[in-house]
From Swiss-Prot:
Belongs to the archaeal IMP cyclohydrolase family. Catalyzes the cyclization of 5-formylamidoimidazole-4-carboxamide ribonucleotide to IMP. GO terms for biological process: 'de novo' IMP biosynthetic process. The keyword Hydrolase applies. It catalyses: IMP + H2O = 5-formamido-1-(5-phospho-D-ribosyl)imidazole-4-carboxamide. Signal peptide: none annotated. It is an enzyme of class 3 (hydrolase). This is IMP cyclohydrolase. It comes from Haloarcula marismortui (strain ATCC 43049 / DSM 3752 / JCM 8966 / VKM B-1809). Transmembrane segments: none annotated. Keywords: Hydrolase, Purine biosynthesis. The lineage of its organism: Archaea, Methanobacteriati, Methanobacteriota, Stenosarchaea group, Halobacteria. Residues 29-52 are annotated as: Disordered. Pathway: Purine metabolism; IMP biosynthesis via de novo pathway; IMP from 5-formamido-1-(5-phospho-D-ribosyl)imidazole-4-carboxamide: step 1/1.
Amino acid sequence: MYVGRFVVVSPEVGAYRVSSRSFPNRQAVQRDGTVTVEPTPDAPETDNPYISYNGVRVTERGAVVGNGSHVDPIAEKLELGYPARDAIAEPLLSLDFEKDDYDTPRVAGIVGVDAADPTTNADGPGAVIGTVRRDALLVEEVTEPTLVATYEENSPTAFDLAATDASDVAREVYDHEYEHAVCSAGVAGSAGEFDVAVYNGE
């Protein structure tokens, strides 16, 4: 099944995977706690605004994963002290779904939300997942690994994720049976102490 790009979010582990039929010549590059999805050196030139973006941003209050330019404002709002729910909801609402031929949803999550955040009822780290589609804006707390994708699985749904460290998470979601994997990123930890890894199918 082809579900497009997707995030998996839980209190201490998260992932983002690029799956693409149209633009497979992309890679995930890690720089100082940020993972950027960008064209490979041999990729054809394109003016598509949805090809390159930060897919992971680590902050002191949680690690943000997502499928587009909304990752940056979510991370910035977290750093400003917004509750995790609001930090996701406001950028998703303002940026809305992608204005492409498919009305592609935006998906996002925050891993390792501080237990003091009013968004979470967790005793330890919490997690929040969200999506904005043409017909809905959904943001909710999650306590177990949960997936939301751009197509087919476009509402938060339970996901069987066994890995617990960042590199294994990145590899596990890349190798998942969903079709047309391009690259992936994994994050593990809690606020202030995150490990980040990428996998490009080498």
